[in-house]
Amino acid sequence: MKKITFIAILLLCICSLTKAKEKVIEQPPFIAWTSTSIQVDKVVLSDTATVLYIKAFYHPKQWIRISGQSFLKDNNGETYALRSGIGIKPDTEFWMPESGEGEFRLVFPPIPTSATSIDFSEGDNVQGAFKIWGIQLKGKALPELLLPQEAIVHKIDINDELPEPKIEYKDATIKGRILDYRPGLVSKIVPIIFDPVKGAYESEEVKINNDGTFVTRVKVPTTTSAAIRLFGKMITFYAVPGEESSVIINTRELCRQQSKFHKDDKPYGEAVYFGGTLAGLSQEYSNCTLKTSILNDYRQLFKDVAGMDAGAYKDFIYGKRANLLASIEKAPISKALKAVLGNQVDAEAAQAISLTEMVIKQAYTMEHKMSKEEAREYFNTAQIELPENYYANAFRPLASINTMAALYNSKLSELIPYYLRRRTDELTKAWGTDKGIYFDINKAGELYSSIKEFTPLTAEQEVILATLPPACQNEVRDANNQLLKTLEANKKKTGFTINEVGNVSNEELFSSIISKYRGKVILVDFWATWCGPCRMANKAMLPLKEELKGKDIVYLYITGETSPLKTWENMIPDIHGEHFRLTDAQWSFLGDKFDIRGVPTYLIIDREGNVKHQKTGFPGVAQIKEELMKVYD
């Protein structure tokens, strides 16, 4: 009996010693991450392993994946390769449950007790890699952050009026600094410019210096909304012609605000400190939590308006507008911000009114639970009865979008080309004029659209351009001059081939297209010139195509008649590969054959002509390479 008792005590002591060697850090604070999709719930340190307990937050029935090349790096620079996963298999899809929340563990070698923090990374060669920096191992606080002198919080005067926007086509300087920066955190940023003439676009990539600073210049025609997307957050500010705007980005606070585990912790200061022109307004706008959106939930909108006619729908939209404007008016914010937010509400109301017939039809199909075929037939044949002068009357109260305040509204860059351009006559009737900033921007935007489609300005268009403000004239002429240079340069470019499909039946079309490349691996890209993700993907693929140069891989691009011929002809010189442009009937047939639901859609064809992989949406360079190599090898 004594012997049994002794053994039991000995085992208990051994267990206690083993347990004592474990250190558990619950929900450790961290400095930065690339995604909110994986978050560290706890870290368990022992002399045999380091285990990260991960909580995953992602779309239900979608997957995430952890690279087998993942590693930890401690603050001393030592790295520790991933050993295994518990509840997840590295390099294999982890499917999210209905709740959109999952959990698993990642096991690494033990880390010395001298380490105070670790970084987790899937590596720089993984597209969209998960990375978390500065995971703390010694307590619940991050190291103290010393703010630079220029990181100030501006005092807001609620009586401040919105200043007149500066209208001039000139460089705006954008400067910034990322706090807690270290090489590898992020190497570049891409400012987004909400240009009222060109529409929203991404400017050139800006390199971040080793001290976390960056600077760039962007030509804008007026005071313009701009933004930087960083660490999952959109940082908005104003770019002003001939002037400087600056942002100091508090990385740890920006990420803390998005953390499931730390969002209620004490703040680390402001997420962003604004400087330069309109810094106070940028700060106030950034911190504002007032709702200004009428169309934030289309599905709910369709439910709300089911059974309404056009008049009732208009009243419903104006009811929502009135509620939003009332909440803005009561808010303790500056007159300047009230003007900006009010203009955004009116822009959304105008968008909603422009969609009257579509919304009523969609609400009807959902209410009656129509099939796709039934809904398509209904959309093509149903006529929504509109009261006389419906659009003119409905747009009449929204004249604020024809005032200078609209130039502060980032929604303007989308509202005009996509929703209101076809309603110009009704807007003229509604407001009793065809003059004003809205009409100037609309005309300039129309001229720019033809340039964007690789069509230089005509003599008639030059006459229209001459009637516009000098800033609009200069921006459009600058774009036209750049186009003329591009067209001339395209004449000398090689590396692309325009192919004809010949006289073949639809059933033989695809096999005929790929037949001349038999014996090679083919990456087929169904794309369109108007498809932004397609164009971004083509640019992203350039380094991979260079890396695989010399291998028996053919890059085959297929588009349809929705890609304007001239635009297509002048875009493909920069897309090396084999190009085909199909008729609408041919495109539709292949769309049905391969069940293509959107562009870009990729097929990978083996050397015998068999489809081995299909994916809609650009999956990233790394995954395309992986799938190509599976077939190639």
Predicted regions and their residues:
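Structural microenvironment flanking redox-active thiols in thiol-disulfide oxidoreductases
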Residues: 536-573, 586-592, 626
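Oxidative protein folding and maturation machinery
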Residues: 251-519
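Thiol/disulfide oxidoreductase modules built on the thioredoxin-like
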Residues: 585-629
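Short, well-ordered beta-strand segments enriched in hydrophobic/aromatic residues
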Residues: 49-59
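Bacterial Sec-dependent N-terminal signal peptides
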Residues: 1-24, 631-633
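Conserved redox-active cysteine motifs that mediate thiol-disulfide chemistry
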Residues: 518, 526-543
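A non-transmembrane, solvent-exposed segment enriched in polar/low-complexity residues
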Residues: 86, 134-336
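Short, solvent-exposed, Trp/other aromatic-anchored flexible loops in extracytoplasmic proteins
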Residues: 81-126
